[in-house]
Amino acid sequence: QLEEILQISLEMRRRVKEQLKKLGGMEFYDVNFSYIDNETFEEHYVSVPEQGGGKLIPEGICNPGQVYTVSRGKSGMIGVFRLESQMLPGNGKFDRTGLGSDRDAKEATDTAFKYLKANGSRISGTLSTTMKDYIINYQDLQGIGMTSKLALPTLIALCSIALGKPTVSTLAVLGEISISGTMIKVDDLANVLQVCLDSGAKKILLPITSAGDLGSVPAELMGSFNIIFYNSAEDAVFKALGVE
């Protein structure tokens, strides 16, 4: 059957594209794998079975403490990372799993906890870093090597679990903060946004320092998102949790 042959052909081409995506470059992302039925005018999208049907960043509201971030991993490739958090009665301990011996990643998560201890009262008077213990599990969803851009996602995850508030749905957290709260803009913004789109993100939390780079992003890609700018670490937390 002609349709079956077409689907197999598109599957094979899609696999080639997935390999080329690992080399980077917008030209490998901007490819439509669909066909239109001339009788019904219905468009059918073709994916590859091994990728599954679900998006890495799911629809709907996540659990408090669950955060998705998109950035460059240790291998140099851009991918999606998931943080899942727990809060227990305790005395202010912060444990992390999933980071192994990655020193840069651990330092970034330490930065977040230190920032929360110093500035938590500016976010909420109910945040406690002395009477609770926190555990965050970090997951490299695409096996590209853990990112070191984890301070801001960790801060948001800690505040989310501490306040019992989930992040807004289909949100990808972009950008990073230093120990002083200085915002660090997103490198290679167009490619990062393309990965966000491929992964199911519909809302993008973006530092205002990256606003000037939006000119490098194709209009079609920009139109796929609700861009939410933040101008400080605290502002990023409020907007990630949907608090005005």
Stretches found by the model and what they are:
Residues I8-G24, L116:
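Short, non-transmembrane amphipathic alpha-helical segments
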Residues Q1-E3:
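Amphipathic, interface-forming alpha-helical segments with heptad-repeat character
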Residues I36-E244:
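Peripheral, non-AAA+ core regions of ATP-driven protein-machinery
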